[in-house]
Each structure stands twice: as structure tokens, then as C-alpha cells.
Amino acid sequence: MIQQESRLKVADNTGAKEILCIRVLGGSSRRYAGIGDVIVATVKEAIPGANVKRGDVVKAVVVRTVKERRRADGSYIKFDENAAVIIKNDNDPRGTRIFGPVGRELREKRFMKIVSLAPEVL
């Protein structure tokens, strides 16, 4: 459950380490984002020489949340951290690698490139 001012770890190799959510996309009064939802964020921490810099405003898709999510079969999925992958405007990832597992909800929301790059889909 990600909302404005939430800080997320970046799970790709764009060079950003941490981002801060500034808007949840998908409706004028949408408050929370879960796995597979797109957010607008600003880069708070980045490594030197990266293709994204501190202060850049980026779009990202949430891939892991600490808040559990109930699935259609009755099971729950939750992770140890909140993480996101920085994406381009056409919903393709800006990086070339994804670190850590991602939720199965990304496949249902048509983020196929992220699912194929991820080492594990839970």
C-alpha cells in the first residue's frame, strides 16, 4: 500500500537507489497503490554517473509491497520491502535488469517485459 510521500527501493539497474512517491496514477482521488500500479515519483538517492539523477521525476510501477494483498484464490502475498521499477512512457522498463522477485499481478496488468526480466515471479 503505497501513498504520497512513501519511499520505495528501486529494483532495477537504472542507477536510482530510492524514490519518493509524489502521485498515484489512475483517478483523481486515488489514494493507494499496490503491486502493478503506476506511480509518479522523484529520485531521492542515485549512484554517480547513472542515467537517472537525484531530483528527476520518473514514472514507476510497484513490484513489491509490505502490505499483504489478497489474491482471487484466497492466498495472500507480501514482501519484506516496498520496491518499484522505473518505466518509460510506453510501460517498458528503463533499466535492463530487475533485482529480486516481483508479484504475479504484473502479468495480469500487462507488464510482460518486467516479468520476463525478473529472476522470480511470486
From Swiss-Prot:
A GO molecular-function descriptor: large ribosomal subunit rRNA binding
GO terms (BP aspect): translation
This protein's GO CC annotations: cytosolic large ribosomal subunit
Keywords: Ribonucleoprotein, Ribosomal protein, RNA-binding, rRNA-binding
Disulfide-bond pairs as recorded: none
One Pfam family cited in the UniProt record for this chain: Ribosomal_L14
Entries under HAMAP family matching the protein: Ribosomal_uL14
Subunit description: Part of the 50S ribosomal subunit. Forms a cluster with proteins L3 and L19. In the 70S ribosome, L14 and L19 interact and together make contacts with the 16S rRNA in bridges B5 and B8.
Its job: Binds to 23S rRNA. Forms part of two intersubunit bridges in the 70S ribosome.
Family statement: Belongs to the universal ribosomal protein uL14 family.
NCBIfam families from the UniProt entry: rplN_bact (TIGR01067)
Protein name: Large ribosomal subunit protein uL14
Origin species: Mycobacterium sp. (strain KMS)
